[in-house]
Amino acid sequence: MMTQTLLIELLTEELPPKALNNLGNHFAASVAEGLEKAQLVDGAAEFTAYASPRRLAVQVKNVKAVQADQKIVKKGPAVANAMKDGAPTKALEGFARGAGAKIEDLTIVHDGKQDVYAYEYVQIGKPLGGLLEDIINQAVKKLPIPKVMRWGSSTFTFVRPVHGLVVLHGGDIVNVSVLGLQSGNKTLGHRFLSDGEITIENADSYAAQMREQGKVVASFAERKAAIQTVLEGQARRLNATAAADEALLDEVTALVEWPVVLEAGFEEHFLAVPQECLILTMQQNQKYFPLLDQNGKLMNRFLLVSNLQTEDPSHIIQGNERVLRARLSDAEFFYKQDQKATLESRLPKLTNVVYHNKIGSQAERIERLQSIAAHIAKALGADAAAAERAARLAKADLVTEMVGEFPELQGTMGKYYARLDGETEEITEAVEQHYQPRFAGDNLPEGKIAAAVALADKLETLVGIWGIGLIPTGDKDPYALRRAALGILRMLMQYGLDVNELIQTAFNSFPQGLLNEKTPSETADFMQARLAVLLQNDYPQDIVAAVLAKQPRRLDDLTAKLQAVAAFKQLPEAAALAAANKRVQNLLKKADAELGAVNESLLQQDEEKALFAAAQGLQPKIAAAVAEGNFQTALSELASVKPQVDAFFDGVMVMAEDAAVKQNRLNLLNRLAEQMNAVADIALLGE
């Protein structure tokens, strides 16, 4: 059957830039999926998504004009029950009637179990035009659009008004109606660089015609790659690097249909303002690409992406420079104003900054952070006074002009202002870094003072918010407690502190009776669950479960334990020892009395004597290895007792009739279990 390329384009008003790429990909994928389900393509649809500020489009290869005819077999009642005394039963008659057939039209087929009556017929394939309208409408409905709008007198809704619809199969228009628009082959190009309508000659010529006649690079991916290439080239020419993160690059790509990269600049005196402020202003407000020199310092040059191409771009450059100058002047003003007061002098204003109405203001919070940070610093062997001072100043920049304008700069501005106030570098860095890690993969705070304040900040948040009942549920976590927990865990994996003791310290910093009394135990359980999630990114679930079953309170040796258990699992003896350990644990659950020391005089059989001797020899080796942090050696020692363990279970009845003998054997197994599980609960391996 002949196939041709299918093109669908929705011509719209300017689409939301941050959502554009996602909308384009969803629309294209939904159309392709609809064509696959309708069997208008063979196998997986080969498609290309297009998305620009004024259009969403998809091009699908090898689309059929008509569905293939299908042989349909409707199966009915079993032959054995379908006839009675030579006449059809009511079941058979009902099946024939439902199938729109006569009894004599039915055939007999085997359904894999028995012979049944069936009605076989050929379903004639439907034409593309009869199916495509519903496919497009369904694709439009499935788009991830949080808010829709109506336009004109239309009752249809979409993310932005839609003014044109192109639907071509090869060179032929497919007649459909979508969002109140009749399909055609005409569209519009660039709003300013293109004149009049463009007639798309063929579905395959779409991208080329839009580029040549419409001055539109329709492919989002192609525009993005082109912008990135030119940005990098321009930056190299200036011996610089363009600060171009993915989010900004995506947003700029979504704002232009014909990208033109231009170089511009600003006055050098603005460089006296911390570069983070200038970069944020350029990127967030103006969508510009700042340029950094070889030392990572901001230059007074930047790159911008225009949607216009002119012989003389100077007016575009000057216009953008003028707008940026106003923005930078504001930042400069805020910076100068903020320097008129020290961070210390700003602290009383934090009384008016509500943290949460149930647990007080930021000023009250600062008191808690100081005590927690000082406690942690002592535990780390660091300067408690420095940690307390850093915690005291950590939130002071929240009431500065600059942070009021750019909340993203909290911490960063605190560092600069603390430095201007004459604080030590250790304290200034802690003020900035106490928010870290802000997200998965973010850097951890550098140095013990910064770590102490960062841990204090996250512990106080977790314990306080949890303690007033604002517990994360499902995908709702408004106070980012999961993120706080992961940040705490990542830091504790670096520093050897007792997680439960830290939680209790944070809890004790709140007024008595303010928080739920179960908060320490509940947050400890929550941390354990988040720790499992964190570790399962790098280790199999059973290995993580085995290590965490010991409920480690110090996390700095977790990685070594996980690696040791992973190595142990590869040993030929591991599976049998894990099974034996599980058996031991099940037997120990049946103990009637408290487990204690092994009485050698009650050991009767050679197998239990041999196991006792092996356990005796094993104990000091494992204890020494664990004490030295050599967990792999500790676990590998277990392999040496496998023969004795196997022989014991093969030849000894643990639950003997003699109560004293039974208790002694359980004591022996308990001693063995202590050694087998010194590093991890190996019974969980393989589950």
Curated annotation (Swiss-Prot):
It catalyses: tRNA(Gly) + glycine + ATP = glycyl-tRNA(Gly) + AMP + diphosphate. It is found in: Cytoplasm. InterPro entries: DALR_anticod-bd, Gly-tRNA-synth_bsu, Gly-tRNA-synth_heterodimer. Its EC number is 6.1.1.14. The keyword Isomerase does not apply. Disulfide bonds: none annotated. Belongs to the class-II aminoacyl-tRNA synthetase family. This is Glycine--tRNA ligase beta subunit.
